[in-house]
Amino acid sequence: QFAKQICNDYNPIHDPDSKRFCVPGDLLFALSLNNYGLSEKMNFDFSGLVPADKLLVFPTAENSELVIKDEREKAYLTLVREGDNNPDPKAIEYLVRSYVAFSGHSFPYILVPLMEQHQVMINNNRPLVMYQSMSLNLDQLELNKPEVKLINADMQVEGKRGNVTLHFAINDGDKAVGRGEKKLVLSGLREFDAQAMEQLIKEYEARKV
């Protein structure tokens, strides 16, 4: 429900009824901030898809580098933090809600124009867009109404793989308070087909009903 209700993300692999279900990367991001607070610099590297039945272990906040693993020591997320820290739950909630709302609009509003530009598209029968990494740089840690806005997006195509980087700004009111970037991997790329893409978007939008 996090993906749908908070992120407005209707990716089929985030549907609990899907056989391919995995925990949304944005949920791992939110849980990490909830556990460790906001730091001036934060880098998140995702190293695996988390199945529904996995119990994750969040280590105590003793080090600048924290690795979130399951009970069998398989790593799923590495968080590296620098600078001052703010554990205020309100500031964390404000930033999480703004960021995941931005993130949830990646498809179709950002990714489809990129794919069309490069004349490639994800497999419409098994669409797969994966979180690779994300970084945040905050100029201040006291946040009231942060808003995450896209600056620009680019895509590098390597065979059937597409590497996408979303650059974004973080504003609080009329003040710039930070910036960051999100990296995604698009798998199983094929030649762009406008009709197939239109159908994929329709199916995605239908999940919102």
Language-model features and meaning:
Residues 1-54, 99-124:
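Hydrophobic, proline/glycine-rich low-complexity stretches
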Residues 150-152:
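Long, helix-rich, hydrophobic modules that act as membrane-proximal anchors or helical bundle/coiled-coil regulators
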Residues 1-2, 50-52, 60-147, 156-209:
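HotDog/MaoC-like acyl-thioester-processing domains
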